[in-house]
Amino acid sequence: MFEGAAALNLDAKGRLAIPARHRDALLAASEGSLVLTAHPHRCLLLYPSPAWQPIRDQILKASSLDPRAASIKRVLVGNARTEEPDSAGRILIAPELREYAKFEKTVYLVGMGTHFEIWSEAGWKQQNDLAAEALSGDLPPGFGDLVL
């Protein structure tokens, strides 16, 4: 189970070092293969390959004749890349994906349970600001009984 957010720096080649606290669990869940893809909110998603496969299969079942479904397929499946971590636990983020997500030097790796989101520094700040604003009112369905 992946959780928590970490500010990380990409190296000069665009590689991201997976933090030690997540590395072993991610590599075990991934069977050595990770999938990076774009998300419609301009972040990237990082999945262990076995966790991505059923999601990909579900996406591919949608009709390509529906313009919205076709757009979702293009973003999620069309941008998907399989990557293998190097011996130092780094993964290469392709230039196209870095450009899509507007990455500069610092990115945020955000644990989302079964996978990670990877945000640009500006994108992560914006998401936190939007969340604070959205949560100042009524809670969304399913969160009414949540006790913190």
UniProtKB/Swiss-Prot annotation:
Q: Which gene encodes it?
A: mraZ
Keywords, sorted A to Z: Cytoplasm, DNA-binding, Repeat, Transcription, Transcription regulation
Instruction: Set out the biological process GO terms recorded for this chain's protein.
Output: negative regulation of DNA-templated transcription initiation
**Which organism does this sequence originate in?**
Dechloromonas aromatica (strain RCB)
Mind listing the GO molecular function terms for this protein?
DNA-binding transcription factor activity; transcription cis-regulatory region binding
Does the keyword field hold Membrane?
no
State where it is primarily located: cytoplasm
- InterPro entries with a match to the protein in the record: MraZ (IPR003444), MraZ_C (IPR035644), MraZ_dom (IPR020603), MraZ_N (IPR035642), MraZ_sf (IPR038619), SpoVT-AbrB_dom (IPR007159), SpoVT-AbrB_sf (IPR037914)
Per UniProt, residues of the SpoVT-AbrB domain are 5-51, 80-123
Q: Which PANTHER family match?
A: TRANSCRIPTIONAL REGULATOR MRAZ
Q: What highest taxon heads this organism's lineage?
A: Bacteria
What's any one GO cellular component for it? Answer: cytoplasm
Q: Does the keyword Transcription regulation apply?
A: yes
In Swiss-Prot or TrEMBL terms, this protein is called Transcriptional regulator MraZ
Q: Where in the cell is it found?
A: Cytoplasm, Nucleoid
Residues forming coiled coils: none
Q: What family is this protein classified in?
A: Belongs to the MraZ family.
Q: What interactions and quaternary structure are annotated?
A: Forms oligomers.
